[in-house]
């Protein structure tokens, strides 16, 4: 479980996340939607402490993953990033072979013998429905794959180090419909063993894949009930009107 307790994130005097108190349950998918610049990506970066070295970045309150406050002074950021995997908008593959891309992180963090690498590679590539497509091409450069395949490869590399939490920052925004459907199916298959936070601009997608949908507006999170119809506000970035009757996470 991920827990925010009166959490605020700010850059100098500008508060991006304000007084957030909310729980994201384990073994489920929570989708986060909101206007551009509302702080969605900042919230993801907070969970793996990617903003630590940004000048004037500061926090108040606490964030707990599995009951551990990740911003305690004695918190081990290296161990945190083993527990939290993040997938970005555009696939991030290295100019190495498909095989080497999968085991990239394993070499550093997993206690596994090199002789077991092939079995691990097959296992995670099967998990992301990519094995049958690449099993005869493992020595080829990962950059020869399509974008959809590269995104699944990125996810396979993340799964290889066995994270508890998966953070998905609009992972299908640059993909075609077929690849998007493949990623959505894949993430659904992973939710029983991971806490997943999926950021998207696509409201229909959020409601179709997530167990819970939250809206981030002006630094505050509001719930979007599955029974609440979403009416897109073409002339305003505000989501307030469609959330008047929603209940769930307090502001």
Regions of interest found by a model, annotated:
Residues 162:
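Conserved catalytic motifs of ABC-family nucleotide-binding domains
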Residues 194-199:
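Conserved H-loop
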Residues 62-79, 139:
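ABC ATPase NBD Q-loop/coupling interface
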Residues 180-192:
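Helical segment within the ABC ATPase nucleotide-binding domain
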Residues 68-69, 115-136:
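Conserved ABC ATPase "signature" region
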Residues 166-169:
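Catalytic Walker B motif of ABC-type/P-loop ATPase nucleotide-binding domains
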